[in-house]
Amino acid sequence: MPDHIPLPAKQYSVIYADPPWAYQQAGATAKARGTAVKHYPTMTTAEICALPVREIVREGAACFMWATFPNITEAIKVMEAWGFTYKTAAFVWVKKNRKQGGNFMGLGAYTRANAEVCLLGVTPGFKAKTQIRAHNVHQIIEAPFEGHSKKPDETRQRIVELLGDVPRLEM
């Protein structure tokens, strides 16, 4: 397993994750394959699954995990390995072009990709009836694309609005 920063020895109610996927989609253009490794060290799905996240989550915790559509199956595997049960897509980020304001056009094997999803999983003991603090948090986030792997700051704000200012770890 590649070296990684040890996880803090605390207990968290929210994990906000954008795993460093070793993304190698068959059929994608040569330009699109393996772009993450140009920006940061990546990990295989098995390596991400092996991170000791289970050890730092409280009972009834929530995980918000970013994934691209072709990688959703892998993201759900990681959630399960970390002790979470997939529930839904918490957020769908529609990437906007910074300069023209229209929709950003990314790469893709089948269609030109734009949106990314932030999946939601929970651990046993999560009580939506009492833990969800706001029922007006929208799923769609329209925000500019600001560079590889940079997610909209608005996502963090929506997580706090949804679940409150609880102990959370961004990884």
What are the residue ranges of the model-derived segments?
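Class I S-adenosyl-L-methionine-dependent methyltransferase catalytic core
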Residues: 1-171
